[in-house]
């Protein structure tokens, strides 16, 4: 039993099996047939075969294309998340002027002070919206 386990789990067999399993199916099928020597016919030991690397450049090209697609998707997701801030700016402006109307209805004597606060709130909200829009354009076109 021990000799059988020793034969099945030789380091060269493990190394060769792990590299074959990690390669694509087309790379395994397209391999060139290796010639066996007289030594390998006579003994039961596993002879390590050289691995072909004919498909390695095409695999790295596919990986770079996938990497570019992931980068492009990340750009669009980031720009979309930054654009949400523009919608938040619109909601903020609506809240500011809604509060102005409610405040004026409650106390008409503070009309001038409420209006100046409303303009300040509008300016801050609009500035944040423009900042978010600028970040979205930077993500799309500068990165």
Curated annotation (Swiss-Prot):
InterPro entries: ATP_synth_F0_csu, ATP_synth_F0_csu_DDCD_BS, ATP_synth_F0_csu_sf, ATPase_proteolipid_c-like_dom, F/V-ATP_Csub_sf. The record marks 126 as: Reversibly protonated during proton transport. Keywords: CF(0), Hydrogen ion transport, Ion transport, Lipid-binding, Membrane, Methylation, Mitochondrion, Transit peptide, Transmembrane, Transmembrane helix, Transport. Trimethylated by ATPSCKMT at Lys-111. Methylation is required for proper incorporation of the C subunit into the ATP synthase complex and mitochondrial respiration. Residues 1-68 form a transit peptide. The modification N6,N6,N6-trimethyllysine is found at residue 111. The keyword Kinase does not apply. It is found in: Mitochondrion membrane. GO terms for biological process: proton motive force-driven ATP synthesis. One of its GO terms (cellular component) is proton-transporting ATP synthase complex. It comes from the Eukaryota. It is a multi-pass membrane protein. Pfam families: ATP-synt_C. The keyword Cell membrane does not apply. GO terms for molecular function: lipid binding; proton transmembrane transporter activity. The chain crosses the membrane at residues 84-104, 119-139. Belongs to the ATPase C chain family. F-type ATPases have 2 components, CF(1) - the catalytic core - and CF(0) - the membrane proton channel. CF(1) has five subunits: alpha(3), beta(3), gamma(1), delta(1), epsilon(1). CF(0) has three main subunits: a, b and c. Interacts with DNAJC30; interaction is direct. It is linked to This protein is the major protein stored in the storage bodies of animals or humans affected with ceroid lipofuscinosis (Batten disease). Mitochondrial membrane ATP synthase (F(1)F(0) ATP synthase or Complex V) produces ATP from ADP in the presence of a proton gradient across the membrane which is generated by electron transport complexes of the respiratory chain. F-type ATPases consist of two structural domains, F(1) - containing the extramembraneous catalytic core and F(0) - containing the membrane proton channel, linked together by a central stalk and a peripheral stalk. During catalysis, ATP synthesis in the catalytic domain of F(1) is coupled via a rotary mechanism of the central stalk subunits to proton translocation. There are three genes which encode the ATP synthase proteolipid and they specify precursors with different import sequences but identical mature proteins. This is ATP synthase F(0) complex subunit C2, mitochondrial. It comes from Bos taurus (Bovine).
């Amino acid at each position: 039993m021990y000799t059988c386990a020793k034969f099945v789990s030789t380091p060269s067999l493990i190394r060769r099996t792990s590299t074959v399993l990690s390669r694509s199916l087309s790379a395994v099928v397209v391999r060139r047939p290796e010639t066996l020597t007289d030594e390998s016919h006579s003994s039961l030991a596993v002879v390590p075969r050289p691995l072909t690397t004919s498909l390695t450049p095409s695999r790295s090209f596919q990986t770079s294309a996938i990497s570019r697609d992931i980068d492009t998707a990340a750009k669009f997701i980031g720009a979309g998340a930054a654009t949400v801030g523009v919608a938040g700016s619109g909601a903020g402006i609506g809240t500011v002027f809604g509060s102005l109307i409610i405040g004026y209805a409650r106390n008409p004597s503070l009309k001038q002070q409420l209006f100046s606060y409303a303009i300040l709130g509008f300016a801050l909200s609009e500035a944040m919206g423009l900042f978010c829009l600028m970040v979205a354009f930077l993500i799309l076109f500068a990165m």
